[in-house]
Amino acid sequence: MKPTPINIKNKRASFDYEFIDTYTAGIVLTGTEIKSIRLGKASLVDTYCYFVQGELWVKNMHIAEYFYGSYNNHSARRERKLLLNKKELRKLEEAGKNPGFTIVPVRLFINEKGLAKLVVALAKGKKQYDKRESLKEKDDRREMDRMFKR
């Protein structure tokens, strides 16, 4: 029996931001953290990325404590280091310094090798009217789908 694929998305990010470029990064995790992710007990709500001394870190990513973990369990909202190539890190850091741009986690998944990966995007914040426009387009698409189903 094939295990269910883990695909945790930050739905709010696509509403609040316009994605310019995306990167797939590895995450430095402890044993109980990867076990919780495999159970689907993670959330990307209110998560953001920042640089410290040329390294990319993710803050506020919630990974629930592992139920079967002992006293050695992890802290649910600790900061976690992201792993990217130096070239990608430099490119992201330079672009992230520009006003209006930020680095946002978009999706957390487990690849074919069983490693946890985080898709991060270089993003620009949307204005209020852009958000309304996105909602209108989404509603229009939904209406069109309903019409074609009949």
UniProtKB/Swiss-Prot annotation:
InterPro entries, alphabetized: SmpB, SsrA-bd_prot, SsrA-bd_prot_CS
Cytoplasm is among the record's keywords: yes
GO function terms (MF aspect): RNA binding
GO cellular component, as recorded: cytosol
SUPFAM superfamilies the record matches: Small protein B (SmpB)
Principal subcellular localization: cytoplasm
One GO process term, biological-process aspect: trans-translation
Keywords, sorted A to Z: Cytoplasm, RNA-binding
Entry keyword Cytoplasm: yes
Annotated region (Disordered), positions in chain: 130-150
Compartments, as annotated in UniProt: Cytoplasm
PANTHER family: SSRA-BINDING PROTEIN, TMRNA-BINDING COMPONENT OF TRANS-TRANSLATION TAGGING COMPLEX
Family per similarity comment: Belongs to the SmpB family.
Biological function: Required for rescue of stalled ribosomes mediated by trans-translation. Binds to transfer-messenger RNA (tmRNA), required for stable association of tmRNA with ribosomes. tmRNA and SmpB together mimic tRNA shape, replacing the anticodon stem-loop with SmpB. tmRNA is encoded by the ssrA gene; the 2 termini fold to resemble tRNA(Ala) and it encodes a 'tag peptide', a short internal open reading frame. During trans-translation Ala-aminoacylated tmRNA acts like a tRNA, entering the A-site of stalled ribosomes, displacing the stalled mRNA.
NCBIfam families per UniProt: PRK05422.1 (NF003843), smpB (TIGR00086)
Protein name: SsrA-binding protein
Organism: Phocaeicola vulgatus (strain ATCC 8482 / DSM 1447 / JCM 5826 / CCUG 4940 / NBRC 14291 / NCTC 11154) (Bacteroides vulgatus)
Gene of this entry: smpB
